[in-house]
């Protein structure tokens, strides 16, 4: 769990996302409250429940990007899902309890990665022995092994091919569901789970010494790990620190004028209620309590309104944050300020071809103006419009770049107007092209 202060979390998000201070503050406080709860004692810790968040704002203003960046910062089990992917329990499709099962899998992968680092030194020695066995045989004299060990550590044998036995991952085993079987409620059953113990679990692979290194270290690390303890830690991490980001929550609001339930809308809302309030979900790794999982829901709400959600669901999302539509100044900052801004990305991409892009300040102004103009006349898709406009402006350069090695190409306001000016003015054309 991260121990960043709210101010540090906001400044970290500022590196990638322009504006939206209220949303950044809300998620930073929610994340810090997870850490604060961990410092409490006994019964009081159980009583402190997370304050779930509902982010409301037009498309393309940074809701999903905040979730993506938060996932990297959180250092906790984090899952981003679209609410539209689920159907009511009992119908064909994924039910909402799958969210918790997926979150457990994320946590197990995180804990395993962390624990592998603890046993890495021992795993490296064991992996080295397996490579030596493949090179000189298990019965070779100690002098021979030592001479090969020195060569191995010096990197002299990196390109030599060896045959090693590796564990089959079972990735090729198909998954299926058996109606009415308990396993079906716990997610799809893998044929590998049923028949995996009947042999065929390892296979011989021919690899270079260098490429076998990581595979063998991972295998030896997993042998040293206590799987049961690892699973318990992962479940505990989910129950205490888990974060679920529910995107497109507005798409499961009831449609106007529709009578009766709707299995992919109201039905999903009803199924989400106990999950957000706190329930126990069965997974193949054990039961998981959802009382302290933090839920962050987000939606554009350009057709539906937050009040169209079931009243009970609204009550379970007590913190409301409104994200502002992007202004021309925001568009300009998005092009230049973030660490991996669009301008920096395109300049770096062209440099791989030996072409230097010189994008002037007035070109950046022109790009922002075009994006704002098209958003206001066609459909407001926020910052995503910048990608469309940039692609259109640099289309010719991208196509001819391999033939222009060593050139410096100046992109100014006139260049931008020449490529997209007419399209931006013609609403009918921009509807289809921009």
Swiss-Prot record:
Positions contributing to ATP binding: 18, 60-65, 247, 312, 384
Task of the protein: ATPase subunit of a proteasome-like degradation complex; this subunit has chaperone activity. The binding of ATP and its subsequent hydrolysis by HslU are essential for unfolding of protein substrates subsequently hydrolyzed by HslV. HslU recognizes the N-terminal part of its protein substrates and unfolds these before they are guided to HslV for hydrolysis.
Protein name (database record): ATP-dependent protease ATPase subunit HslU
Keywords assigned: ATP-binding, Chaperone, Cytoplasm, Nucleotide-binding
Gene transcribed to yield this protein: hslU
GO cellular component: HslUV protease complex
Family membership noted in the UniProt record: Belongs to the ClpX chaperone family. HslU subfamily.
Matching InterPro entries: AAA+_ATPase (IPR003593), ATP-dep_Clp_protease_ClpX (IPR050052), ATPase_AAA_core (IPR003959), Clp_ATPase_C (IPR019489), HslU (IPR004491), P-loop_NTPase (IPR027417)
Subcellular location: Cytoplasm
Subcellular location, principal: cytoplasm
Assembly, per entry: A double ring-shaped homohexamer of HslV is capped on each side by a ring-shaped HslU homohexamer. The assembly of the HslU/HslV complex is dependent on binding of ATP.
Record-level Gene Ontology MF annotations: ATP binding; ATP hydrolysis activity; peptidase activity; proteasome-activating activity
Any single biological process term in GO: proteolysis involved in protein catabolic process
């Amino acid at each position: 769990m991260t121990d960043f202060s709210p101010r540090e979390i906001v400044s970290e998000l500022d590196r990638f996302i322009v504006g939206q201070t209220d949303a950044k503050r809300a998620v930073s406080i929610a994340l810090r409250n997870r850490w604060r709860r961990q410092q409490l004692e006994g019964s009081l810790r159980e009583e402190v429940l997370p304050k779930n968040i509902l982010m409301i704002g037009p498309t393309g203003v940074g809701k999903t990007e905040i979730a993506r960046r938060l996932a990297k910062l959180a250092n906790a089990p984090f899952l981003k899902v679209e609410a539209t992917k689920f159907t009511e329990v009992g119908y064909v499709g994924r039910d909402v309890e799958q969210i918790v099962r997926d979150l457990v899998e994320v946590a197990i992968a995180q804990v395993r990665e962390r624990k592998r680092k603890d046993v890495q030194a021992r795993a490296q020695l064991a992996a080295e022995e397996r490579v030596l066995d493949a090179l000189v045989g298990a019965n070779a004299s100690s002098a021979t092994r030592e001479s090969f060990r020195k060569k191995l550590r010096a990197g002299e044998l990196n390109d030599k091919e060896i045959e090693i036995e590796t564990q089959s991952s079972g990735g090729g085993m198909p998954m299926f569901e058996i109606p009415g079987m308990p396993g079906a409620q716990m997610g799809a059953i893998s044929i590998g789970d049923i028949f995996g113990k009947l042999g065929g679990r390892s296979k011989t692979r021919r690899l270079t010494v260098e490429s076998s290194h990581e595979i063998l270290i991972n295998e030896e690390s997993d042998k040293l790990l206590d799987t049961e303890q690892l699973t318990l830690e992962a479940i505990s991490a989910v129950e205490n620190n888990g974060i679920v980001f529910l995107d497109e929550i507005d798409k499961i609001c009831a449609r106007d004028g529709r009578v009766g339930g709707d299995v992919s809308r109201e039905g999903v809302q009803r199924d989400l209620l106990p999950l957000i309030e706190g329930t126990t979900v069965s997974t193949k790794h054990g039961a998981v309590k959802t009382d302290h999982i933090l839920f962050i829901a987000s939606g554009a709400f350009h057709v539906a309104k937050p009040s169209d959600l079931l009243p009970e669901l609204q009550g379970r999302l007590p913190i409301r944050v409104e994200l502002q539509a992007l202004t021309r100044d925001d568009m300009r900052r998005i092009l230049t300020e973030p660490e991996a801004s669009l301008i920096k990305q395109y300049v770096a991409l062209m440099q791989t071809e030996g072409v230097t892009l010189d994008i002037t300040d007035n070109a950046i102004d022109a790009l922002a103006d075009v994006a704002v103009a098209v958003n206001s006349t066609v459909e407001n898709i926020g910052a995503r419009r910048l990608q469309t406009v940039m692609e259109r402006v640099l289309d010719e350069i991208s196509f001819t770049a391999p033939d222009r090695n060593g050139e410096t190409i100046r992109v100014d306001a006139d260049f931008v107007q020449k490529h997209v000016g007419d399209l931006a003015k013609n609403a009918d054309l921009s509807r289809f092209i921009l």
